[in-house]
Design a protein with these regions (language model features):
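N-terminal interaction/assembly modules
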Residues: 1-93, 116, 137, 141-152
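Short, well-structured alpha-helical interface segments that form or flank functional binding sites
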Residues: 13, 112, 130
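Alpha-helix N-cap/helix-initiation sites
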Residues: 81, 101, 125-129
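Short coil/turn residues that cap or connect secondary-structure elements
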Residues: 92, 96-99, 127
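Short amphipathic alpha helix immediately N-terminal
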Residues: 96-112
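Helix-turn-helix DNA-binding module
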Residues: 110-126
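DNA-recognition helix of helix-turn-helix
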Residues: 122-142
Length: 152
């Protein structure tokens, strides 16, 4: 029983890669906005405190370089998302049951909420959860027989 639970958890992690990568992209986008905001601030803090001996004279340049680096990471992450979705689609469509395929597709490839998954599949949320659980079991079996695909 425990091995089955571990297999199902590994299958869920495998299927959830695009969603995790998308959250990482959103975090990086927020960081870029914050960095650009810091870089373009023109107000100087007026204080009677002494200045440091070595002020960062390239503050704006440093912030913009960090933002550009994050933008490059986002492009690489988007490629990783697309690759993961292609792998997941191929694995999902290898499952025999059409309803399980549809639930897994809408949940993990389209990254839809449960209510949207149920609506797209024309069933109640509880029924979508049942198809999901069976689909994840079948995915775990496939992954255990073929060797677990590399998580990136």
């Amino acid at each position: 029983m425990e091995a089955n639970t571990v297999g199902k958890e590994a299958a869920r992690e495998y299927l959830d890669r695009p969603r995790r990568l998308q959250h990482g992209i959103e975090n990086k986008k927020h960081k870029i906005v914050a960095l650009r905001d810091l870089a373009t601030r023109t107000t100087a803090a007026i204080s009677d405190m002494p200045r440091s001996d070595s002020p960062n004279l390239q503050r704006m340049e440093t912030m913009l370089c960090k933002a550009a680096d994050l933008e490059r990471e986002i492009v690489a992450d988007q490629v990783a998302i697309d690759t993961a979705k292609e792998e997941i689609m191929a694995a999902v469509f290898d499952i025999e049951d059409y309803r399980e395929q549809q639930v897994l597709y809408h949940r993990y490839v389209e990254c839809q909420a449960w209510s949207a998954v149920a609506e797209a599949c024309g069933c109640h949320i509880r029924t979508a959860h049942r198809f999901h659980d069976r689909g994840v079991e079948h995915m775990a079996e496939k992954l255990s027989h073929s060797g677990h695909p590399k998580n990136t």
